[in-house]
Structure formats: structure tokens, C-alpha cells
Amino acid sequence: MKNESTFIDVPAESSSAMKGKAPLIGVARDHTTSGSGGYNRGLAIFDFLLRLAAIVAALAAAATMGTSDETLPFFTQFLQFEASYDDLPTFQFFVIAMALVGGYLVLSLPISVVTILRPLATAPRLLLLVLDTGVLALNTAAASSAAAISYLAHSGNQNTNWLPICQQFGDFCQKSSGAVVSAFVSVVFFTILVVISGVALKRH
């Protein structure tokens, strides 16, 4: 009977062995979580680098437009022919808007760093998605309105008798056109940033 009791105790040991296998399942889940975290961290690093590039594009657009000023070498007794960004309200709006876009991007860098350090955190990524979408709209509005005025400066409008001025004010038009191109580059960067935030949130 003692030998039989000894054989009865064997299933108890096997059940404890089965309990010992339970942590292996938890370890497998941890590997899955760490894999997702590594993917999101890679997206966060790319997000940070894109923000640096967008800062350069936005501030370059504001600075270039803000310094677009040209005075023709000839003048009359009563008139001096000059073209400047502050002569056009649309270009004034462009300078202010792009400066705000650049300032926002600088302030968003710490939040982007948080997403690198905590790749699985949802709140900072969601905050960036909402703010980036709003600033993207402002950036697009500034770039589009300035592009329309720049087109009129180059081509004019025969229906309204608006004459092109870029033949006379070549430097002014070149600077303003460069600023518009830089602003649209910033729009592309912002679009990618919004997509990155959406993908990262979907991975959660």
C-alpha cells in the first residue's frame, strides 16, 4: 500500500510541473509587446527627424517671404517703384502663419521625444495627431493663398486688367515663389507626420 501511495503522488508533481510552464506563455506575450514597442519607437524617431526638417522648411518660408523687398533703380519726383511682402495682405498672412507653424513645430519636439522614450503611450501620440492636423490646415491655407498671388504676379489676369509685375520685380517674385515652394514642402512633411501618428495609434 505504501508503494501505491507513492505512485499516487506522481500526478501531483506533474501538475506542479504544468504550473511551472505557465510563465512561458507570459514571456511569449512580452516578446510580442516589445516587438510592437520597437516598431513604434522607430516611427517616433522618424517623426522627430521629420519635425526637424519641417522646422527648417517653415522658418525658411517665413524668412524668405519676410525679406522679399525690391525697389526699382528709377523713380519719379512723386513716385518710387517698390514691391514688398507687406504691400499684400495675403503675403503678410503667409509670414505670420508660417512663423506660427515653425514655432509650433519647435514646441512639439519635447512631445515627440516622449513618444520615443515611451513608444506604447497613447496620449502624447494622440495629442500630436490632433495638433498636427490643425497646423497642417493653417500651413496649407497659407501656402495656397500665397501661391495664388504669386501666380498673378507672374501671369497677371487679362479679364481684370491685372498686369504681371515679375518682369520688373524679378528678385521679389523669385523670393516669394521660393517661399511658397518651401511652404508646400512643409505641407508634405506635415502630411507624413499625420500618417505616422495614425499608423502608430493603430499599432496600439
Curated annotation (Swiss-Prot):
A Pfam family assignment: CASP_dom
Cytoplasmic compartment segments: 1-42, 114-125, 200-204
Subcellular location(s) per record: Cell membrane
Keywords: Cell membrane, Cell wall biogenesis/degradation, Membrane, Transmembrane, Transmembrane helix
Spans within the Extracellular topological domain: 64-92, 147-178
Residue ranges of the TM segments: 43-63, 93-113, 126-146, 179-199
Gene Ontology CC annotation, any one: Casparian strip
GO biological process terms, semicolon-separated: cell wall modification; cell-cell junction assembly
Domain of life according to the entry: Eukaryota
UniProt main location, coarse: membrane
Topology versus the membrane: Multi-pass membrane protein
Gene Ontology molecular functions: protein homodimerization activity
Biological role: Regulates membrane-cell wall junctions and localized cell wall deposition. Required for establishment of the Casparian strip membrane domain (CSD) and the subsequent formation of Casparian strips, a cell wall modification of the root endodermis that determines an apoplastic barrier between the intraorganismal apoplasm and the extraorganismal apoplasm and prevents lateral diffusion.
Subunit text: Homodimer and heterodimers with other CASP proteins. Interacts with CASP1, CASP3 and CASP4.
Family indicated by similarity: Belongs to the Casparian strip membrane proteins (CASP) family.
Name this polypeptide is given: Casparian strip membrane protein 2
Native species: Arabidopsis thaliana (Mouse-ear cress)
Lineage: Eukaryota, Viridiplantae, Streptophyta, Embryophyta, Tracheophyta
